[in-house]
């Protein structure tokens, strides 16, 4: 899980979602692509 000021999709399987007011990126193909805005 990377915590970044700016979250971006890294690959085509990444999805940007908003969970409890926090913007996150989840990825089914590569767990290293997980990000959280903060």
Swiss-Prot record:
Full protein name: Large ribosomal subunit protein bL36
Stored Pfam families: Ribosomal_L36
This protein's GO CC annotations: cytoplasm; ribonucleoprotein complex; ribosome
High-level lineage: Bacteria, Pseudomonadati, Pseudomonadota, Gammaproteobacteria, Alteromonadales
Family: Belongs to the bacterial ribosomal protein bL36 family.
One BP annotation, GO: translation
PANTHER family: 50S RIBOSOMAL PROTEIN L36, CHLOROPLASTIC, LARGE RIBOSOMAL SUBUNIT PROTEIN BL36C
HAMAP family: Ribosomal_bL36 (MF_00251)
Keywords, sorted A to Z: Ribonucleoprotein, Ribosomal protein
Domain of life: Bacteria
InterPro entries, sorted: Ribosomal_bL36 (IPR000473), Ribosomal_bL36_sp (IPR035977)
